[in-house]
Amino acid sequence: YMKQASKSQKRIEFLDLISEAITHDDIFGTLNYKKKSEDQIKQFIYPHLVKDLTDYVVGQGQEDKEKAKEIVKSSINWEGDVNTTVSHILFMGTRNRPDMTIEMNGMKIAIEFKKGKRGTDLRAGIGQSMIYATHYDFVLYLFVDISDDKRIQNAQGGVNELSLTGELWDNYNIKFIIA
C-alpha cells in the first residue's frame, strides 16, 4: 500500500491553478491542436504554465518578477527544455517518463499529456499515470480529445466515468482532465 500525499485545500488549489494553466483557452480555443503533435502542444502549454506559476510565486510574496520566473523555470522539468531531463521510472522492465514534472510547494507533480480519439489512447495515459503515481505526490493527466464529435470529452460526466475518475483521484492522487 502506498502512502498518499495529503490533499490539503492549499494543495488542491495549487493543482487547480496548474490544471487551468495547461488547459488555457489560448491553447485550446485558438490552436488547431488536432493537427499539432503532442510535442507542439506542449510547446504551446509551457509559456502559459510559466506565466501562471510566476504570478502565483509573486502572489506568495516574491516581489522580483524575474526572480519569480527563475524559480518557476527551475521547478519545471520537461523534454522541451534542453537543460532539464525528466527521470525514468522503471516498471516491469520498461522505462517510463512523464511529459513534464513540477517540484514546488514541497510537492512533486507529474504531468502526462495524451492526444487521441480512441479508448486505447485514453487507457494508455491512465496506465502511465498510475505508474507515475507511485513516484510522485500528484499526477495531472491531460487527455486532448481529437475525436470529431468530442465524444470522449462529452462522456466525462457519465456515472461510470465519474466513478473511475473519482477512484483515480481518491486512491492514486491522479487528476484527470480532458481538453
Regions found by a protein language model. Name each.
Residues 118-123, 133-172, 176-179:
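Nucleic-acid nuclease catalytic cores
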